[in-house]
Regions:
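Mid-chain, well-packed structural core segment of small domains
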Residues: 66-69, 73-99
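A glycine-rich phosphate/pyrophosphate-binding beta-strand-loop-alpha-helix module
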Residues: 96-100, 116-119
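Short alpha-helical scaffolding segments that buttress acidic/His motifs in well-ordered protein cores
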Residues: 45-49, 66-73, 101-106
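Short, charged low-complexity intrinsically disordered segments located at boundaries
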Residues: 43-45, 76, 98-103, 132-134
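Substrate/cofactor-recognition hotspot
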Residues: 111-115
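Short amphipathic alpha-helical surface patches that mediate protein-protein
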Residues: 86, 103-107, 122
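Acidic, glycine/proline-rich low-complexity segments that act as flexible tails and inter-domain linkers
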Residues: 1-62, 90, 116-134
Length: 134
């Protein structure tokens, strides 16, 4: 039996906050509550992405984070890569693992995509004050 949309939403919201942090998620949800346009995409992201994919136990969150970094590099989605770099740290990825995922993605996605990804990840790591992790 498939879970209801409300169940997916609640599970997705919990997963989303765990990975990305409440300080990132809450303002986006609040904006969505005030604006029909952004509300629709916030609901879709929370239900289907986070409630569907991220709550499945087949892959752990650390593995999913590493996959997301590679996929976002390939797609050139650097804004999302920044938030998922911070999420990867929360999910137990080391700076060394993040570096290797981006290096591996660069081989297949090309140097320009890799340069953008490394630059964006560096910005995210700087915001997380990761000197103690290096």
């Amino acid at each position: 039996i498939e879970p209801s949309n409300q169940d997916l939403y609640e599970a997705g919201l919990a997963a989303r906050k765990k990975v990305l942090g409440e300080e990132y998620v809450n303002p986006n949800i609040e904006k969505g509550e005030k604006d029909h346009l952004t509300g629709k995409i916030q609901t879709m992201v929370t239900e289907y992405c986070w409630g569907g994919a991220w709550t499945d136990d087949t892959l752990d969150h650390k593995t999913r984070s590493m996959l997301n970094l590679a996929i976002l590099t390939a797609l050139g989605k650097m804004n999302e890569l920044k938030s998922h770099t911070r999420g990867a740290l929360r999910n137990g990825c080391t700076v060394e693992e993040i570096t290797e995922v981006l290096a591996h993605a660069t081989v297949y996605c090309g140097i320009p995509a890799g340069v953008d990804a490394f630059r964006s990840a560096r910005e995210a790591l700087d915001q997380e004050n990761t000197e103690d992790l290096l």
